[in-house]
Amino acid sequence: MSNVFQNTSTVTVLQGDYKVTTDPKVVFSTVLGSCIAACIYDEQVGVGGMNHFLLASSAGSGGVSARYGVHAMELLINGIMKKGALRSNLKAKVFGGAKMSANLSDIGANNADFVQRFLRDEGIPVISSSVGGTSARRVRFHACSGAAQQTHVADDRRLGEEERAAVARTQAAPARKPAAADNVTLF
């Protein structure tokens, strides 16, 4: 399965973003600390995607943004379905949720618990997951086949500092309201 990563173009999925493709030449990539990447796919149709969310919920801030788990999951699943996936074929792989700082609450564990519960409630089986621990991960995902690769990041101290700053910015800034053209169906 590792040969699906050869001769491909890499598309980076940043915090608060999601990507969907039917192109077998595209591989999604992201680096995670306490954040979560849900990789959801329908290998029979050849479509899939990855999200990268920062926090499980907006904690009462009223935020509707892909920075938050529920919205990120809804956007990803709807995006995959719009590309022709059958809900009954969807499978997931989940990564991230590390405890990046002893000085912060365990945001990673909260994120991991959220995504596992969300997928279970939605009836989407989690085929594999790598969550928790104390180190960052780089994840590559071939969305059309569901193949995934993970490597642990050796020097993740800077990532932990960046995540603390991102959490602070997210909690301080109001979330962007979706444009009318976003047209997302929540289920």
Swiss-Prot record:
Enzyme Commission identifier(s): 3.5.1.44
A single GO BP: chemotaxis
This protein's record includes keyword Hydrolase: yes
Entry keyword set: Chemotaxis, Hydrolase, Plasmid
Chemical reaction(s) catalysed: L-glutaminyl-[protein] + H2O = L-glutamyl-[protein] + NH4(+)
Gene3D superfamilies: 3.30.1330.200
GO molecular function annotation: protein-glutamine glutaminase activity
Keyword Hydrolase among record annotations: yes
Lineage top rank: taxon: Bacteria
Family: Belongs to the CheD family.
Role of this protein: Probably deamidates glutamine residues to glutamate on methyl-accepting chemotaxis receptors (MCPs), playing an important role in chemotaxis.
Protein name listed in UniProt: Probable chemoreceptor glutamine deamidase CheD 1
Naturally occurring in which organism (per UniProt): Ruegeria sp. (strain TM1040) (Silicibacter sp.)
Lineage: Bacteria, Pseudomonadati, Pseudomonadota, Alphaproteobacteria, Rhodobacterales
